[in-house]
Amino acid sequence: MWNNEWIKEKDYPAWGDTEVYKKTIGGGYLLTGESPYDAYKRVSNTVARRLSRPELAETFFDYIWKGWLCLASPVLSNTGTDRGLPISCFGIDVADSIQDIGGKNLEMMLLAKHGGGVGIGIN
């Protein structure tokens, strides 16, 4: 949730000083008590640690803070948390049988129903 006491360029980036940004990021992207600054640090540190390249954390943060790198919704919401995966799309491989085509079609429809993008590999 957006906190009106946050300070521009300390708690959120200068480019985020718009009603659209405040409404969007305050609408579920942040953890309880977390500012945009904290969220960007969480993502940057987690990604750098996952890559075994801790020296990249500050570079990732700077790119996000300057608006040079825009994070997909699940990346911002879920990276460094236990509340979901940082993924926007799903991949499905389909075998050459009527049964598999039907089963994978159902899987694709269920993923799409929940907002997931789906890529299909047909063998």
Question: Which residues are covered by each model-predicted region?
Answer:
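Extended catalytic cores of very large enzyme megasubunits
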Residues: 1-123
